[in-house]
Amino acid sequence: MKWSAAAGAALLALPANSAVTASLPLKLETRSSLNSRLSNIHVERSASVEGAISYTYGSCQAKREEEAHHSISQPTDAHHDRLVWVIPENVQSGGCISAWSRANGRLVGRSRPQSFDFKSIKMRRDLKARATKPSDSVAIHMTTDNGINPWGPWFDGVKLLEDKEISTVDVEKAKSKNIAIVGAGMSGLMTYLCLTQAGMTNVSIIEGGNRLGGRVHTEYLSGGPFDYSYQEMGPMRFPNTITLGNETYNVSDHQLVFQLAEEMNSLNGHSKNLSVDFIPWYQSNSNGLYYYDGIKNPETGLPPTLAELAANSSLALTRVSNNSTKSLSQKVDAFLPDTDKFFAEMAQNMFKAHADWLSGGLAGLPGDQWSEFGFMVNYLRGSLNDTAFLSASAHSYWDTLYEGMYFSASTWKTIDGGLNRLPLSFHPLVDNATTLNRRVERVAFDAETQKVTLHSRNSYKDSFESSEHDYAVIAAPFSIVKKWRFSPALDLTAPTLANAIQNLEYTSACKVALEFRTRFWEHLPQPIYGSCSTTSDIPGIGSICYPSYNINGTDGPASILASYISGADWGDRWVSTPEEEHVQYVLNAMAEIHGEELVKEQYTGQFNRRCWALDPLESASWASPTVGQHELYLPEYFQTRNNLVFVGEHTSYTHAWIASALESGIRGSVQLLLELGLVDEAKATVDKWMARWIDV
């Protein structure tokens, strides 16, 4: 059936509640913008209708079901109050949704005329087509053929629902599904927030430890948050804006953190005890110290500052590199994307940038299929010696690119009182739904009942307790999940997912915080205010970060992150050193850099060491996929396997940041809502959290 554009426009002008429509027993309406190929149709009953019902879309003047443009649904469930409308590509505005009695063919319901946002629909289709363009690669390519496009704009929700054959939704039943979230880190907390705000009424959290926040861990060496002697033993900062040329951009993916803080402050009535407030983070300071080869300024007794180094380059050690190393470095730079252009793209839309990188970001080559080492040696024919000098790894350049953009940020933020205040703000929301000190170790799925059973215990000495759920969202890192037992075995039902759980690589970090009686670093001849700018060649120390909070504060002690180092070489190696020995080593390094007498007089004896590989609930710091693992594993995270949804920073496009965990929680929530046919709620979640690259 066809109707003219003029007729459609005329129909749109009709009043919404005509006498005929108002007298019918079924009220039909859409409640969200028709800007994609999916929508919910809401069904309300003013009177009962006997027998089955057919739903169609077509002319608002149609008198018979056969006159419709297309059929929407012929549900067998008489108790439905919502339909899932998969909208054909050749649809036109101006038509109405109609309901017909299948017993006698009579019209029993009709909506007001519908208007489609074709511009948005086309934009989504074009973005999807670009993200899934064919390649000669032998790697797995996720296209619209299988309904999921995980490399950039998340997944194709239309195809997902077509595959699931969902046409009607009992909303009350869907929203009462029993959902367990395993893990109360930031991805688990975000999942809980999204699902409950979407109206899910039976959501619980099972947490293996005794606190919320996971790897968000602020250590208060003296007092509380506003005694200002703390350090971040997990994440500690958020890139906010980046200036490239004459343009300044928001680092858009990290805006999720700031938006979440606003949301939690609002939910908590702006309570002072629960507030999440941001202050500037000082990433760099020109008075940071440069301590290499034992060189110090004889006048101050301190290493040269970065400002002094800039004024006198002879103070810096110069690494000898031969011409072939320089040439190889220049060749690599020529193949990588233009820095300013790609940094701007990543800042504005990390997800589109990721898709572009995978499809041909390495000068036309698929970005995730070349490791740094393999590209230099096998493609550019660099020597092993030159490649070693350039620190080529088994990872692709993606991590180098997005971390390069983040650490080029012009402004940064952190949370006043410590990042712990972000998970702290969730307590009023989740406490009644959270079970602490329950470590899930086994997961069983019953295909007949479609139920998930979680087996957990507090200690390895305890017997297992079990709980049954309709779905489980796994928000624990794979470094822990790899020790779990699944029934049926995942390598039989989802071998690529099982491969990801067992083989996704992680990086470990160690941090040592030391407390001092005063903020002595702010009273040096060239005072240091915040920043991680002090560096040295003392083995195993890495970054030294001075606090960005309470700058020029006069009361009480303060703490320095005296060592922050990661990677297989030191993040793993330090765990074999006893804590007291490790702390003494770091204290000695601080004394060597800042002056032995000063440091020993100022040190209070309070410290904290956290090597994340020793944490029984984490076993590592963050995911660090090797070459090919993004391209191979990301599609698996977008598929619901045995009623399990996997979230966490390890399932995101970037790693090691709170924003990565939050993004995965939003994605997992939308994935589950779409599984249940709650399209309007999925759209609302997407729109609220600005994740508009999902096609729903």
From Swiss-Prot:
Q: What induces it?
A: By addition of L-amino acids after nitrogen starvation, by starvation in phosphate buffer and by the addition of protein synthesis inhibitors, D-amino acids, or ATP.
Give the reactions, separated by semicolons, that this protein catalyses.
an L-alpha-amino acid + O2 + H2O = a 2-oxocarboxylate + H2O2 + NH4(+)
Cofactor(s) needed: FAD
A Pfam match: Amino_oxidase
Spell out the Gene3D superfamilies in the cross-references.
1.20.1440.240, 3.90.660.10, FAD/NAD(P)-binding domain
Residue pairs linked by disulfide bridges in the UniProt entry: none
Which amino acid positions bind FAD, per UniProt? E207, R215, M236, R237, V440, E649, I658, A659, S660, A661
The alphabetical list of record keywords is: FAD, Flavoprotein, Oxidoreductase, Zymogen
Keyword set includes ATP-binding:
no
- Top EC category: oxidoreductase
Supply the residue numbers of the propeptide(s) excised during maturation: 1-130
Q: Name one GO molecular function term.
A: L-amino-acid oxidase activity
Annotated binding of substrate, by residue: R237, Y564
| Example of a GO biological process term | amino acid catabolic process
Q: At the top level of its lineage, which domain of life is listed?
A: Eukaryota
Q: What is its EC number?
A: 1.4.3.2
Q: InterPro entries per the record?
A: Amino_oxidase (IPR002937), FAD/NAD-bd_sf (IPR036188), Flavin_monoamine_oxidase (IPR050281)
Q: Oxidoreductase: is it a keyword of this entry?
A: yes
**Protein family (similarity comment):** Belongs to the flavin monoamine oxidase family.
What is this protein called in UniProt?
Answer: L-amino-acid oxidase
Question: Gene encoding it?
Answer: lox
